[in-house]
Amino acid sequence: MADETMTGEQILEHVEHKSFAATSDRTAASLSASGVAAEDVARAAAQAAYDKKGEDVQVLDLTELSDVCDYFVLATGTNNRQADSIVDEIEEKVAEACGEHPFSIEGREQKTWMLMDYGSVVVHVFTPEARDFYRLEKLWGDAPQLPLNLL
């Protein structure tokens, strides 16, 4: 990866910028733009990633840690093509289940780290190498994981 010379501080700054580039507006009740609970959007995204064979699917609860978003959804595709397919599946299934569409999707060109910004929910889909490099779980180590019953 070209970013391997970045310092820890630069990585954190990059992650914060990438995670919150499209919006920094939150509602007090953690509702999405259409009034759906942010947790429901996060769970729908996680289920969609799992359904598309995403690996290590997690939802980090940031409600007590961040003023910008409430949940991170993390998933890994085995390669660029699968990661891109996971993003498509999440976009479709979250729209069906919650009536939500992302404000923006970043990283579609490189397909190593794609980010879907739903406002109070930010979805990160990685290739294995990018997930290992950025380690968002470590950067947000204080964030509890939502228990998921992925079927």
Regions found by a protein language model. Name each.
Residues 69-71:
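Short amphipathic alpha-helical segments
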Residues 1-59, 63-64, 81, 85-88, ...:
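Long, contiguous binding/interaction regions
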